[in-house]
């Protein structure tokens, strides 16, 4: 059985729990809830857990280093489990995708996302799979304040559906491969 390291990006602490920038943590928490895998073990400068899901051995990781240092945590876990970049799936928020949309991608730049920038620096590559959870862009104001703000009330009302769609995309990526998953989820 192959193994996957599935990483949700976010910032630690209750202050950030419902912020847009924590969409990766939220998806990972939803996956943990659905799969029964507890993400409570302190390891790799983060919280981790492991188990079987989608016919794979999966290692779940929520770096607790703050977003701009996430790469350290991910690099530690990849080394420990002796996994390669092809075994890595990163879940993160994306300003360039409207709220409610979930898109899949292999490789690419960081697009100004500090978590992805840290991963590129620590891993020396961006050649890994991503689940991009759309948070949209602010109509007015600063992007930093926008991503660090909680989801709006109307967004919260449909957030569970977005998280479930993200988990469905992840499951299809693992079971049926990235091309099939991209053809379905990127067309939505």
From Swiss-Prot:
GO terms for biological process: protein quality control for misfolded or incompletely synthesized proteins; rescue of stalled ribosome. Its EC number is 3.1.1.29. It catalyses: an N-acyl-L-alpha-aminoacyl-tRNA + H2O = an N-acyl-L-amino acid + a tRNA + H(+). TRNA binds at residues 16, 66, 68, 114. It is found in: Cytoplasm. Pfam families: Pept_tRNA_hydro. CDD domains: PTH (cd00462). The active site is at 21 (proton acceptor). Its main location: cytoplasm. The record marks 11 as: Discriminates between blocked and unblocked aminoacyl-tRNA. One of its GO terms (molecular function) is tRNA binding. Keywords: Cytoplasm, Hydrolase, RNA-binding, tRNA-binding. PANTHER family: PEPTIDYL-TRNA HYDROLASE (PTHR17224:SF1). Hydrolyzes ribosome-free peptidyl-tRNAs (with 1 or more amino acids incorporated), which drop off the ribosome during protein synthesis, or as a result of ribosome stalling. Catalyzes the release of premature peptidyl moieties from peptidyl-tRNA molecules trapped in stalled 50S ribosomal subunits, and thus maintains levels of free tRNAs and 50S ribosomes. This is Peptidyl-tRNA hydrolase. The gene is pth.
């Amino acid at each position: 059985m192959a193994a996957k390291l599935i990483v949700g990006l976010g910032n630690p602490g209750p202050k950030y729990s419902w912020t847009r920038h924590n969409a990766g943590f939220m998806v990972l928490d939803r996956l943990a809830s659905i799969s029964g895998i507890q993400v409570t073990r302190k390891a790799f400068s983060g919280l981790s857990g492991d188990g079987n899901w989608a016919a794979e051995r999966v290692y779940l990781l929520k770096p607790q280093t703050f977003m701009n240092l996430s790469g350290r945590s991910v690099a530690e876990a990849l080394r420990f489990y002796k996994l390669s970049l092809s075994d890595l799936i990163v879940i993160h928020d994306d300003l360039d995708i409207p709220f409610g949309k979930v898109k899949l991608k292999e490789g690419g730049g960081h697009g100004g996302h500090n978590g992805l920038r840290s991963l590129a620096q620590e891993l020396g590559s961006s050649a890994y799979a991503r689940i991009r959870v759309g948070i949209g862009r602010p109509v007015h104001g600063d992007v930093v304040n926008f991503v660090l703000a909680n989801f709006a009330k109307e967004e919260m009302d449909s957030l569970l559906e977005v998280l479930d769609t993200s988990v469905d995309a992840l499951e299809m990526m693992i079971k049926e491969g990235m091309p099939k998953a991209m053809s379905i989820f990127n067309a939505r």
